Amino acid sequence: MARYTGPAWKLSRRLGISLTETGKEIAKRPYAPGQHGNSRRKMSEYGLQLQAKQTLRHMYGVNERQFNRIFNDAGKMPGIHGENFMFLLEARLDNVVYRMGMARTRRAARQLVNHGHIQVDGARVDIPSFRVKPGQTISVREKSKNFVVIKEALEVAPATKDFVTFDAEKLEGTFVRLPERSELNDQIQEQLVVEYYSR
């Protein structure tokens, strides 16, 4: 399944959750778009599981094949499958760039990585799905340090999560550790995703 490239606000309203984690998309109209959007039907158990999966997939901007592969990798780790799955999604390079405040959205962060503006431990990496390891340093390439998009994003960036650090002067940060579940979006129901794949 291809990656969704339409308006994030429209998809957020359809899924009933803020995919950008700002809450702005659904603050004024907390119902699905369209003529009958204000009347949500009661979902089946399968429908809830599917929606949880689609919500998580769209939030991190991952296509179906990548999503499935990350889910399987999470199943090989010790601990809770669903939580490990979210931790691996958080360790994607595009997401770490977003968490550090260098991009306003994960989609914008993915573009920065794709276009070669980002380095990992001093080496250029242009693969958004690159899995960042704890302790690795993420920085902006020297020739990209005056990039307006990055500067504008940093001006409005929220405080960084405790599992990343970022120096706005050097445009450099560290992925300190994998996050704890309590540090991530509490509206995500990752256990429903596990149930979806366990059918």
From Swiss-Prot:
One of its GO terms (biological process) is translation. The keyword RNA-binding applies. Gene3D superfamilies: Ribosomal Protein S4 Delta 41, Chain A, domain 1, RNA-binding S4 domain. CDD domains: S4. GO terms for cellular component: small ribosomal subunit. The keyword Magnesium does not apply. SMART domains: Ribosomal_S4, S4. Keywords: Ribonucleoprotein, Ribosomal protein, RNA-binding, rRNA-binding. One of its GO terms (molecular function) is structural constituent of ribosome. Residues 91-153 form the S4 RNA-binding domain. One of the primary rRNA binding proteins, it binds directly to 16S rRNA where it nucleates assembly of the body of the 30S subunit. With S5 and S12 plays an important role in translational accuracy. Part of the 30S ribosomal subunit. Contacts protein S5. The interaction surface between S4 and S5 is involved in control of translational fidelity. NCBIfam families: PRK05327.1, rpsD_bact. Belongs to the universal ribosomal protein uS4 family. This is Small ribosomal subunit protein uS4. It comes from Exiguobacterium sibiricum (strain DSM 17290 / CCUG 55495 / CIP 109462 / JCM 13490 / 255-15). The lineage of its organism: Bacteria, Bacillati, Bacillota, Bacilli, Bacillales.
